[in-house]
């Protein structure tokens, strides 16, 4: 199905005419050569009548049209599909050409970038990669001459004589190998991709088990996503990898290929069924096992890694102890045993039992590097009944490790003792609870949320630091933690790790070479916090019982139900053991390991701060906030929780009688290592006072008695109102006090349930608008005195010329150059008072020494006296002024002599008698909304009157024959 792409179309089309001409010439020459052969043949008419002639079709000009060549890398030969990506081509092949999927699907070569079907790939590997992998050393030819090639140890031809080569597929993650490609692939599905298939694994119900479906599917499993029913667990894993996860290329990359040299006479006794007597050595000791070269080159990815061993005697084969996993499968599946043995030419080994064949326990290991995990093996037919029985009866084969110093292969159980005894290694324990071990070659860092290979894991852990298991000190160098362990904890053994720790064999160069075995304890998902607490309590109890001095233990009754549960759990940890498995978080899609019933609940509470519940209206499974107990909708996501926590009012509140929620590093799990809100320490008295006053100080404002904060307006009662009302209060506060201190901003934010940044930005924006208005609109600064009171002053006064304004007639009067919202009625005066005629107070004498002289036609108004005396105003009506004269708006007059002072003596003549009485008028306030005459009036009313303004009417006076006045309030 794979077709090579066509490139360089321009060059091809240029040469097409030439190629056609050449082909036509070649065809014409061919016809001329053979035309002479057919001249002698003269068929009869009967022969012509018996023949059938086909009509030639007419020439179609559309055939000469240039075709659309596919320049992409992966092209389908059965249809016009082409793609740059192998995954898209594979999906197309699976969906469109499903019937040819298994036989003609492309597979990636594990040695190079070649892709082809199964048969073509095997031919490609045999032709191009097989000679490069056959590395021999010390192999002697039939006549005793060493066999070699120009490059040293490469053999380009198969060995002659009594030896032959067998192709073997092996797993790059472990030591498993077999001659069949599918067997190795099923092994990878079963052993290395269980974590991928677990979220999709579902068990059939009791009805399906009792029905006829159970006969076809004896395993009783199905896919949760598409309800696919496989025949085996490996088929389910393959289904998940190929159809749901689309990571089949990873399985192909994990399968390696190599060749094994096998003697031809090895398989004859076993194929004929001749029993092998235990304890008797064969007569041909060098012909009854697989001889492997000393230099083995195994590909890892697209590179070749070769492990060079020490010197050995030429011509002597090397014997290798093969792991049980490579030859004898587990007791659950006996069918694979014959395949594993038959993969090396031992086809009749399926009937071997524990009394007829065994593996030799005295074989030496093949020296290999620690990075090479596929060890070549030597099968021997020797005795050791016990070893054979143990190898065949074990339900799970053990893992093997290669010593990095002596390059020998050992079981995992005996490797630690070998390294400590033979190489005088010092054991140093450390902790890295932020590392979660996935399998032997991959781990996950919970801090960085990334997967790390085994070769770079130690360097990454040193970046975060390794902790001492005794004193929990953190070190970023191996030498320092080794020195710390020798000095501070020389005789302390420490707690034994519950799981399999990460082992690093190191050689430190501190003066003399020193071998160190670093044992790093990682996070164990199978160990729950309750089980860890119970184990720690049991360990402490055992240590106390070992002490010679008796320990007096006081027993008390549990106060609450939780204490009783904790005590019962510590007393019977076995009964509280829960089923351990894997589950998937529906919010962040994190794979959770641990007790199935508690892992998801702990993760949702610690990471997302929610609890599972049932929606009261929708009747669907949803979540509720652990702070305010608000219920989310059923279509919520993780971002919805984040937005809610920003505005949640119950985050900083702690209900009475309950413990505060700690969202720190409660456990070393993956969910608890994410960033969360930090709860304040309840032991702090200031913070405890803040929690008690959380109704008015929700953002954490604490009062300081030595620094009291007095606000210009009282914000009490505005915290529960709408956002617009709270913003309006801030605007009114700005009009009273535009430059608040930092403590005032904090108190306002805490009282109004606003962020401090919002309050500060609100004041800053209004200040910036005021500065812009001063620059662009050029407003007038009002004087701070009452003009009506000023008109009664009896001494001379001098004003700047900029303080005067000119009064026009009614029909010529206009508005000042200020904003329209300021040109309203005066502040603090009712409409009836403004529109009515007000008499002018003239005092007791008819001729007073007044500083101003009123002009005819000007309206006189009463003036509020700001004095401590209780004197009252006597208002005398002016007969020369009409009662309905409208108040004119002032207009600014530009003075021609700027900077000069205008000093005029204005005389105010009054033609009314002093003995005339006038009604008493009380003092008026300028701004009733912000008046501070009484404590009750100091609070802001909350609204602005439509009649409020910043201008008040001023009296009109005559200066040098002109009608002038003063701006004032």
Curated annotation (Swiss-Prot):
The keyword Kinase does not apply. Keywords: DNA-binding, Homeobox, Metal-binding, Nucleus, Repeat, Transcription, Transcription regulation, Zinc, Zinc-finger. It holds the Pfam family ADNP_N. GO terms for biological process: erythrocyte maturation; regulation of gene expression; regulation of neurogenesis; Wnt signaling pathway. Its main location: nucleus. GO terms for molecular function: beta-catenin binding; DNA binding; zinc ion binding. CDD domains: homeodomain. Residues 732-774 bind DNA. A zinc finger (C2H2-type) spans 74-97, 107-129, 169-192, 221-244, 401-423, 443-464, 466-489, 583-608, 623-647. Interacts with catenin beta-1/ctnnb1. This is Activity-dependent neuroprotective protein a. It comes from Danio rerio.
